[in-house]
Amino acid sequence: MVKIAVDMMGGDDAPGIVLDAVKKAVEDFKDLEIILFGDESQYNLSHERIEFRHCTEKIEMEDEPVRAIKRKKDSSMVKMAEAVKSGEADGCVSAGNTGALMSAGLFIVGRIKGVARPALVVTLPTTDGKGFVFLDVGANADAKAEHLLQYAQLGNIYAQKIRGIQNPSVSLLNIGTEAAKGNSLTKKAYDLFEKNQSFNFTGNIEAKTLMDGNVDVVVTDGYTGNMVLKNLEGTAKSIGKMLKETIMSSFKNKLAGAVLKKDLETFAKKMDYSEYGGSVLLGLDGTVVKAHGSSNAKAFYSAIKQAKIAGEENIVQIMKDTVGE
Protein backbone atom coordinates (compact mmCIF):
# COMPACT_ATOMS: atom_id res chain seq x y z
CA MET A 1 0.00 0.00 0.00
CA VAL A 2 1.29 3.47 -0.99
CA LYS A 3 0.13 6.55 0.92
CA ILE A 4 0.17 9.96 -0.79
CA ALA A 5 -0.45 13.34 0.88
CA VAL A 6 -2.41 15.79 -1.30
CA ASP A 7 -2.87 19.56 -1.08
CA MET A 8 -6.58 20.05 -1.82
CA MET A 9 -6.38 23.85 -1.94
CA GLY A 10 -3.50 24.46 -4.40
CA GLY A 11 -4.10 25.34 -8.06
CA ASP A 12 -6.24 27.60 -10.24
CA ASP A 13 -9.27 25.29 -10.20
CA ALA A 14 -8.87 23.73 -6.75
CA PRO A 15 -10.45 22.11 -4.91
CA GLY A 16 -12.79 20.83 -7.64
CA ILE A 17 -10.26 19.22 -9.96
CA VAL A 18 -8.25 17.87 -7.00
CA LEU A 19 -11.29 16.10 -5.56
CA ASP A 20 -12.18 14.65 -8.98
CA ALA A 21 -8.62 13.38 -9.45
CA VAL A 22 -8.39 11.90 -5.94
CA LYS A 23 -11.74 10.12 -6.36
CA LYS A 24 -10.63 8.55 -9.65
CA ALA A 25 -7.21 7.60 -8.24
CA VAL A 26 -8.56 5.65 -5.26
CA GLU A 27 -11.11 3.96 -7.50
CA ASP A 28 -8.47 2.93 -10.06
CA PHE A 29 -5.72 1.90 -7.62
CA LYS A 30 -6.77 -0.46 -4.84
CA ASP A 31 -3.33 -0.21 -3.22
CA LEU A 32 -3.43 3.59 -2.84
CA GLU A 33 -4.30 5.61 0.26
CA ILE A 34 -4.71 9.39 0.26
CA ILE A 35 -4.33 11.91 3.08
CA LEU A 36 -6.14 15.02 1.87
CA PHE A 37 -5.40 18.42 3.44
CA GLY A 38 -7.76 21.37 3.04
CA ASP A 39 -10.91 23.22 4.04
CA GLU A 40 -13.52 20.80 5.38
CA SER A 41 -16.36 23.01 4.15
CA GLN A 42 -15.30 22.22 0.57
CA TYR A 43 -14.66 18.50 1.07
CA ASN A 44 -17.35 16.24 -0.37
CA LEU A 45 -15.82 12.77 -0.72
CA SER A 46 -16.37 9.65 1.34
CA HIS A 47 -14.02 6.72 0.85
CA GLU A 48 -12.35 4.26 3.22
CA ARG A 49 -8.91 4.96 1.71
CA ILE A 50 -9.19 8.76 1.86
CA GLU A 51 -8.33 10.41 5.17
CA PHE A 52 -9.28 14.08 5.35
CA ARG A 53 -7.53 16.62 7.60
CA HIS A 54 -8.87 20.12 8.04
CA CYS A 55 -6.50 23.08 7.61
CA THR A 56 -7.34 26.65 8.55
CA GLU A 57 -4.94 28.32 6.10
CA LYS A 58 -4.15 28.29 2.40
CA ILE A 59 -1.02 29.43 0.58
CA GLU A 60 -2.02 31.72 -2.28
CA MET A 61 -0.29 31.91 -5.66
CA GLU A 62 0.84 35.49 -4.95
CA ASP A 63 2.31 34.70 -1.50
CA GLU A 64 6.07 35.11 -1.02
CA PRO A 65 7.25 31.46 -0.88
CA VAL A 66 9.57 31.28 2.13
CA ARG A 67 7.50 33.69 4.23
CA ALA A 68 4.32 31.73 3.46
CA ILE A 69 5.86 28.42 4.52
CA LYS A 70 7.16 29.91 7.77
CA ARG A 71 4.03 31.87 8.71
CA LYS A 72 1.17 29.71 7.46
CA LYS A 73 1.89 26.70 9.65
CA ASP A 74 -1.65 25.34 9.35
CA SER A 75 -1.83 25.62 5.56
CA SER A 76 -2.69 22.57 3.45
CA MET A 77 0.70 22.68 1.73
CA VAL A 78 2.74 22.81 4.94
CA LYS A 79 0.73 20.04 6.59
CA MET A 80 1.08 17.92 3.46
CA ALA A 81 4.89 18.34 3.46
CA GLU A 82 5.04 17.53 7.18
CA ALA A 83 3.26 14.23 6.50
CA VAL A 84 6.08 13.27 4.13
CA LYS A 85 8.78 14.45 6.53
CA SER A 86 7.36 12.34 9.37
CA GLY A 87 7.22 9.26 7.16
CA GLU A 88 3.45 9.09 7.41
CA ALA A 89 3.14 9.60 3.64
CA ASP A 90 5.37 8.21 0.89
CA GLY A 91 5.07 11.34 -1.22
CA CYS A 92 2.97 14.44 -1.85
CA VAL A 93 1.24 16.29 -4.69
CA SER A 94 0.24 19.95 -5.00
CA ALA A 95 -0.77 22.30 -7.83
CA GLY A 96 -0.16 25.34 -5.64
CA ASN A 97 2.49 28.08 -5.51
CA THR A 98 5.62 26.57 -7.11
CA GLY A 99 8.11 28.57 -5.05
CA ALA A 100 6.29 27.73 -1.83
CA LEU A 101 6.22 24.02 -2.68
CA MET A 102 9.95 24.09 -3.44
CA SER A 103 10.54 25.86 -0.11
CA ALA A 104 8.39 23.28 1.68
CA GLY A 105 10.40 20.56 0.00
CA LEU A 106 13.73 22.06 1.03
CA PHE A 107 12.90 23.29 4.55
CA ILE A 108 10.36 20.68 5.67
CA VAL A 109 10.96 17.46 3.70
CA GLY A 110 14.70 18.17 3.45
CA ARG A 111 17.46 17.18 1.03
CA ILE A 112 19.06 13.80 0.69
CA LYS A 113 22.42 14.02 2.45
CA GLY A 114 25.06 14.38 -0.25
CA VAL A 115 22.79 16.08 -2.80
CA ALA A 116 24.17 19.58 -3.29
CA ARG A 117 21.07 21.00 -4.95
CA PRO A 118 17.72 19.40 -5.80
CA ALA A 119 16.53 19.66 -9.40
CA LEU A 120 13.07 20.20 -10.84
CA VAL A 121 12.33 17.60 -13.50
CA VAL A 122 9.55 17.39 -16.09
CA THR A 123 8.68 14.92 -18.82
CA LEU A 124 8.08 16.69 -22.12
CA PRO A 125 6.41 15.32 -25.27
CA THR A 126 8.30 14.28 -28.39
CA THR A 127 7.22 13.75 -31.99
CA ASP A 128 7.33 9.98 -31.58
CA GLY A 129 5.08 10.12 -28.51
CA LYS A 130 7.52 8.64 -25.97
CA GLY A 131 8.61 11.90 -24.31
CA PHE A 132 11.89 12.81 -22.61
CA VAL A 133 12.99 13.71 -19.07
CA PHE A 134 14.24 17.31 -18.77
CA LEU A 135 16.02 18.86 -15.77
CA ASP A 136 16.67 21.31 -14.13
CA VAL A 137 13.72 23.49 -15.15
CA GLY A 138 13.98 26.10 -12.43
CA ALA A 139 14.95 24.83 -8.99
CA ASN A 140 18.35 26.56 -9.22
CA ALA A 141 19.16 29.41 -11.61
CA ASP A 142 22.90 28.93 -11.09
CA ALA A 143 24.74 25.64 -11.21
CA LYS A 144 28.24 24.22 -11.18
CA ALA A 145 29.38 21.32 -13.35
CA GLU A 146 29.26 19.04 -10.31
CA HIS A 147 25.59 19.95 -9.84
CA LEU A 148 24.83 19.03 -13.45
CA LEU A 149 26.51 15.67 -12.87
CA GLN A 150 24.19 15.00 -9.95
CA TYR A 151 21.22 16.10 -12.06
CA ALA A 152 22.25 13.53 -14.67
CA GLN A 153 22.43 10.79 -12.05
CA LEU A 154 19.05 11.77 -10.58
CA GLY A 155 17.46 12.05 -14.02
CA ASN A 156 18.83 8.65 -15.00
CA ILE A 157 17.20 7.02 -11.95
CA TYR A 158 13.94 8.87 -12.63
CA ALA A 159 13.84 7.68 -16.25
CA GLN A 160 14.49 4.10 -15.15
CA LYS A 161 12.05 3.88 -12.27
CA ILE A 162 9.24 6.27 -13.21
CA ARG A 163 9.32 5.96 -16.99
CA GLY A 164 10.43 2.34 -17.16
CA ILE A 165 13.42 2.86 -19.47
CA GLN A 166 16.05 0.18 -18.87
CA ASN A 167 19.19 2.02 -20.00
CA PRO A 168 18.29 5.68 -20.55
CA SER A 169 20.39 7.80 -22.87
CA VAL A 170 21.53 11.00 -21.11
CA SER A 171 22.53 14.13 -23.03
CA LEU A 172 23.77 17.59 -22.08
CA LEU A 173 21.95 20.60 -23.57
CA ASN A 174 24.43 22.72 -25.50
CA ILE A 175 24.81 25.05 -28.49
CA GLY A 176 26.39 22.30 -30.58
CA THR A 177 26.86 18.55 -30.54
CA GLU A 178 30.67 18.66 -30.57
CA ALA A 179 32.45 18.06 -27.26
CA ALA A 180 34.40 21.32 -27.52
CA LYS A 181 31.29 23.48 -27.94
CA GLY A 182 29.68 25.57 -25.20
CA ASN A 183 30.74 27.71 -22.27
CA SER A 184 32.99 26.83 -19.34
CA LEU A 185 30.07 25.20 -17.48
CA THR A 186 29.03 22.83 -20.26
CA LYS A 187 32.62 21.99 -21.20
CA LYS A 188 33.49 21.00 -17.63
CA ALA A 189 30.19 19.15 -17.25
CA TYR A 190 30.86 17.26 -20.48
CA ASP A 191 34.19 16.03 -19.10
CA LEU A 192 32.56 14.92 -15.83
CA PHE A 193 29.74 13.15 -17.68
CA GLU A 194 32.18 11.35 -19.95
CA LYS A 195 34.24 10.05 -17.01
CA ASN A 196 31.22 8.91 -15.00
CA GLN A 197 30.16 5.29 -15.43
CA SER A 198 26.81 5.39 -13.59
CA PHE A 199 24.73 6.42 -16.63
CA ASN A 200 24.70 6.17 -20.43
CA PHE A 201 26.07 9.53 -21.60
CA THR A 202 25.40 10.14 -25.29
CA GLY A 203 26.99 13.57 -25.71
CA ASN A 204 25.57 17.03 -26.35
CA ILE A 205 22.15 17.82 -27.77
CA GLU A 206 20.93 21.06 -29.34
CA ALA A 207 17.63 22.72 -28.41
CA LYS A 208 16.29 22.34 -31.95
CA THR A 209 16.31 18.52 -31.68
CA LEU A 210 14.92 18.19 -28.14
CA MET A 211 11.53 16.97 -29.33
CA ASP A 212 12.81 14.52 -31.93
CA GLY A 213 12.79 11.64 -29.44
CA ASN A 214 16.48 10.79 -29.84
CA VAL A 215 17.36 10.89 -26.11
CA ASP A 216 15.66 9.90 -22.85
CA VAL A 217 17.17 12.45 -20.43
CA VAL A 218 18.39 16.00 -21.11
CA VAL A 219 20.36 17.92 -18.47
CA THR A 220 20.90 21.67 -18.13
CA ASP A 221 21.05 24.40 -15.47
CA GLY A 222 17.81 25.78 -14.03
CA TYR A 223 18.06 29.17 -15.73
CA THR A 224 18.41 27.70 -19.20
CA GLY A 225 15.95 24.90 -18.51
CA ASN A 226 13.21 27.24 -17.34
CA MET A 227 13.57 29.45 -20.42
CA VAL A 228 13.48 26.42 -22.74
CA LEU A 229 10.40 25.06 -20.96
CA LYS A 230 8.51 28.36 -21.19
CA ASN A 231 9.53 28.78 -24.82
CA LEU A 232 8.16 25.33 -25.68
CA GLU A 233 4.92 26.05 -23.80
CA GLY A 234 4.49 29.40 -25.55
CA THR A 235 5.28 27.97 -28.98
CA ALA A 236 2.77 25.15 -28.52
CA LYS A 237 0.04 27.62 -27.52
CA SER A 238 0.83 29.88 -30.47
CA ILE A 239 0.75 27.00 -32.96
CA GLY A 240 -2.56 25.81 -31.55
CA LYS A 241 -4.04 29.30 -31.80
CA MET A 242 -2.80 29.81 -35.38
CA LEU A 243 -4.08 26.39 -36.43
CA LYS A 244 -7.52 27.10 -34.98
CA GLU A 245 -7.67 30.52 -36.65
CA THR A 246 -6.67 28.99 -39.99
CA ILE A 247 -9.33 26.25 -39.76
CA MET A 248 -12.05 28.76 -38.85
CA SER A 249 -11.02 31.31 -41.51
CA SER A 250 -13.11 29.87 -44.37
CA PHE A 251 -15.82 27.33 -45.16
CA LYS A 252 -13.30 25.24 -47.12
CA ASN A 253 -10.92 25.12 -44.16
CA LYS A 254 -13.76 24.22 -41.80
CA LEU A 255 -14.60 21.24 -44.01
CA ALA A 256 -10.92 20.20 -44.03
CA GLY A 257 -10.85 20.55 -40.25
CA ALA A 258 -13.88 18.29 -39.91
CA VAL A 259 -12.22 15.65 -42.10
CA LEU A 260 -8.99 15.84 -40.09
CA LYS A 261 -10.67 16.06 -36.68
CA LYS A 262 -9.59 12.61 -35.42
CA ASP A 263 -6.03 13.10 -36.67
CA LEU A 264 -5.83 16.50 -35.00
CA GLU A 265 -7.13 15.00 -31.74
CA THR A 266 -4.47 12.26 -31.94
CA PHE A 267 -1.80 14.92 -32.51
CA ALA A 268 -3.07 16.99 -29.57
CA LYS A 269 -3.03 13.95 -27.28
CA LYS A 270 0.54 13.10 -28.30
CA MET A 271 1.66 16.61 -27.35
CA ASP A 272 -0.46 16.85 -24.17
CA TYR A 273 1.71 17.50 -21.08
CA SER A 274 -1.02 16.13 -18.80
CA GLU A 275 -0.28 12.62 -20.05
CA TYR A 276 3.04 12.78 -18.17
CA GLY A 277 1.89 14.16 -14.82
CA GLY A 278 3.63 16.98 -12.97
CA SER A 279 7.18 18.12 -12.30
CA VAL A 280 9.13 16.44 -9.51
CA LEU A 281 11.68 17.96 -7.14
CA LEU A 282 14.44 15.35 -7.21
CA GLY A 283 17.08 15.05 -4.51
CA LEU A 284 14.72 15.43 -1.55
CA ASP A 285 14.23 12.94 1.27
CA GLY A 286 10.71 12.25 -0.01
CA THR A 287 8.74 12.48 -3.24
CA VAL A 288 7.39 15.97 -3.98
CA VAL A 289 5.31 16.33 -7.17
CA LYS A 290 4.26 19.73 -8.52
CA ALA A 291 1.18 19.58 -10.73
CA HIS A 292 0.74 22.49 -13.14
CA GLY A 293 -1.18 25.39 -11.60
CA SER A 294 -3.74 25.23 -14.41
CA SER A 295 -4.05 21.44 -14.21
CA ASN A 296 -7.36 19.81 -15.01
CA ALA A 297 -8.49 16.66 -13.19
CA LYS A 298 -6.72 14.46 -15.74
CA ALA A 299 -3.37 16.18 -15.21
CA PHE A 300 -3.68 16.08 -11.42
CA TYR A 301 -4.62 12.39 -11.58
CA SER A 302 -1.45 11.76 -13.60
CA ALA A 303 0.57 13.59 -10.93
CA ILE A 304 -0.91 11.37 -8.21
CA LYS A 305 -0.09 8.31 -10.30
CA GLN A 306 3.46 9.63 -10.70
CA ALA A 307 3.89 9.95 -6.92
CA LYS A 308 2.42 6.48 -6.43
CA ILE A 309 4.91 4.90 -8.84
CA ALA A 310 7.77 6.73 -7.10
CA GLY A 311 6.66 5.21 -3.80
CA GLU A 312 6.31 1.73 -5.26
CA GLU A 313 9.74 1.90 -6.88
CA ASN A 314 11.35 3.26 -3.70
CA ILE A 315 12.99 5.94 -5.82
CA VAL A 316 14.14 8.09 -2.87
CA GLN A 317 16.13 5.23 -1.33
CA ILE A 318 17.72 4.43 -4.70
CA MET A 319 18.79 8.07 -5.01
CA LYS A 320 20.24 7.93 -1.50
CA ASP A 321 22.24 4.83 -2.41
CA THR A 322 23.44 6.31 -5.72
CA VAL A 323 24.02 10.02 -5.06
CA GLY A 324 23.78 10.41 -1.29
CA GLU A 325 26.50 10.12 1.30
UniProtKB/Swiss-Prot annotation:
Reactions performed catalytically: a fatty acyl-[ACP] + phosphate = an acyl phosphate + holo-[ACP]
InterPro entries: FA_synthesis (IPR003664), Phospholipid_synth_PlsX-like (IPR012281)
Broad class of where this protein is predominantly found: cytoplasm
GO molecular function: phosphate:acyl-[acyl carrier protein] acyltransferase activity
Annotated localization: Cytoplasm
GO CC terms in record: cytoplasm
Keyword Cytoplasm: yes
Pfam families: FA_synthesis
Keywords: Cytoplasm, Lipid biosynthesis, Lipid metabolism, Phospholipid biosynthesis, Phospholipid metabolism, Transferase
EC number from the UniProt entry: 2.3.1.274
BP term (GO), one: fatty acid biosynthetic process
Associated pathway: Lipid metabolism; phospholipid metabolism
Entries under NCBIfam families matching the protein: plsX
HAMAP family on file: PlsX
Assembly: Homodimer. Probably interacts with PlsY.
PANTHER family xref list: FATTY ACID/PHOSPHOLIPID SYNTHESIS PROTEIN PLSX, PHOSPHATE ACYLTRANSFERASE
Official protein name in the record: Phosphate acyltransferase
Originating species: Staphylococcus epidermidis (strain ATCC 12228 / FDA PCI 1200)
